[in-house]
């Protein structure tokens, strides 16, 4: 645990010194996830299909974030490689494609899937007998995690994560800021999908 705390401090100091975005590392994860994370083999977080023209590089940010969390909370060797650009969701079930890439990367457990950041509907507030729409910036995060055997290229599991919605005000209302806030909340869902653990809670989050 001391080594994990040290890693969190190093990451924070490094990103602060470089002026880069700080990736928040979870302070704790459910015990049932920790047991499974400790047994993970080599893992390759390959890349994600993100749909058309996301407002920032959603694939890159998701790959970076998941790799950072796995390096912190698992003993697996997390492969460092350029994120794949997955142009269609059909590619996720292309056995020959993943078998070839799996061989090139030493037959790891492959983490891929889809991640979409969508505009949220206007927020509705009831004040007495009046209903008003607040023009707050909001986003909805939708993700499906696909786990692939790097030796055979076969899909081992596919799990759609609970969707999340969040609104922000001022400097916390950008798509990137809201994305990081929702991913922070969703990380136990990601760990559950990667390790094959039954979700602690499958209720969607709206805030």
Residue ranges: model-predicted function:
Residues 124-128, 172:
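Outer-membrane beta-barrel translocator domains and adjoining extracellular loop/strand segments
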Residues 39-117, 150, 154-158, 181, ...:
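N-terminal segment of the mature soluble domain
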Residues 101, 131-135:
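Outer-membrane beta-barrel proteins
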Residues 91, 122-125:
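Short, well-ordered secondary-structure micro-motifs
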